[in-house]
């Protein structure tokens, strides 16, 4: 067996869609967790849209599936239950409130830290929910908790 072909096949397989459940189930619960190609993800149903991201918060590995969804600056965010970090459902950006120390009377404004949480693609087909892992080449802070030594789930040997 050619090891190069095997590695290519494994890489392709990692980006195939995986059925994670039924649409009717997630609409009731508004969230669900799944393992997609050995990566734990959480899928949210919020305001008529589906969103999927790594299950562990980029900051300290908090369980995002246990967080509340709130709107900040017109963006729907999951709030990590451990340290209250705010992550946009649509883009995975971390949000924070900026305060100008030279003008204490100024109102704090919402700012982005950039993309911190890896977002995955969700598709609905014939009542089934499918998740495809992100192929984006950049590193996200949440990758630290989804891969390598801090990975929460173990692959079967």
UniProtKB/Swiss-Prot annotation:
Domain Rieske: 16-127, 17-131
Record note on cofactor: Binds 1 [2Fe-2S] cluster per subunit.
Domain of life: Eukaryota
N-acetylmethionine, modified sites: 1
Annotated gene: Rfesd
Gene Ontology MF terms in the entry: 2 iron, 2 sulfur cluster binding; metal ion binding
Organism of derivation: Mus musculus
Cofactor(s) required, per the database record: [2Fe-2S] cluster
Pfam families: Rieske_4
Annotated positions binding [2Fe-2S] cluster: 57, 59, 80, 83
Gene3D superfamilies: Rieske [2Fe-2S] iron-sulphur domain
Alphabetically ordered keywords of this record: 2Fe-2S, Acetylation, Iron, Iron-sulfur, Metal-binding, Phosphoprotein, Repeat
Keyword Transferase attributed: no
Listed name of the protein: Rieske domain-containing protein
Phosphoserine PTM positions: 6
